[in-house]
């Protein structure tokens, strides 16, 4: 190992460019990138109990709400530039798993969030994209639900980090009005 380090040092002193030097520089870039990872979702890291409130039919005019419990565990991935949220949802008639996958783009300074429902393992939702301001994150996407063009909005509110909240809302009139159809209240598990 000392001979390799000596070779790299002598090569660099002579001004020659080596693959080993590229590897060292690449590792330095990775380390620098990981040090500057975003902290927007740090509040979500850990294990939570979740209270859900959801419209029975998401695009319906009826306002019949269902309430149920769940749990969630979130951990960082991608050197802090992403996180993975593993959920268990206990609907009134059945339980299932789902995952939220989040990644941060340092060039746009925006997050993308994908939802994968365990009941439909071959379909991942269109990502919502957005950012946090003053501990509130707004994320948007355009999708087609029940053959209706629909704007989707996720809102993450971390102003109370010990009790963060998430909401989903849909708009079928191009964002003029929004109908909140699902909310989650998180409480850190013991």
Predicted feature residues:
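Initiator methionine at the very start of the polypeptide chain
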Residues: 1-2, 19
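Bacterial N-terminal signal peptides
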Residues: 2-11
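Hydrophobic small-molecule pocket/channel-lining residues, especially in calycin-type beta-barrels
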Residues: 17-190
């Amino acid at each position: 190992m000392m001979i390799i380090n000596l070779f790299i040092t002598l090569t660099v002193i002579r001004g020659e460019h080596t693959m080993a030097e590229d590897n060292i520089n690449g590792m330095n870039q990775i380390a620098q990138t990981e040090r500057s990872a975003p902290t927007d979702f740090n509040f979500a890291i850990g294990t939570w109990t979740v209270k859900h409130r959801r419209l029975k039919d998401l695009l319906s005019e009826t306002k019949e709400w269902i309430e149920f419990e769940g749990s969630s565990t979130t951990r960082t991935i991608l050197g802090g530039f992403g996180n993975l949220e593993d959920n268990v949802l206990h609907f009134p008639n059945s339980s299932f798993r789902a995952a939220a996958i989040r990644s941060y783009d340092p060039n746009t300074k925006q997050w993308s969030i994908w939802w994968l429902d365990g009941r439909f393992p071959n379909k991942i939702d269109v990502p919502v994209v957005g950012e946090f301001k003053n501990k509130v994150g707004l994320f948007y996407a355009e999708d087609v639900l029940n053959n209706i063009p629909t704007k989707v909005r996720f809102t993450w509110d971390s102003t109370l980090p010990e009790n963060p909240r998430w909401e989903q809302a849909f708009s079928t009139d191009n964002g003029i009005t929004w109908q909140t159809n699902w909310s989650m209240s998180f409480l850190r598990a013991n």
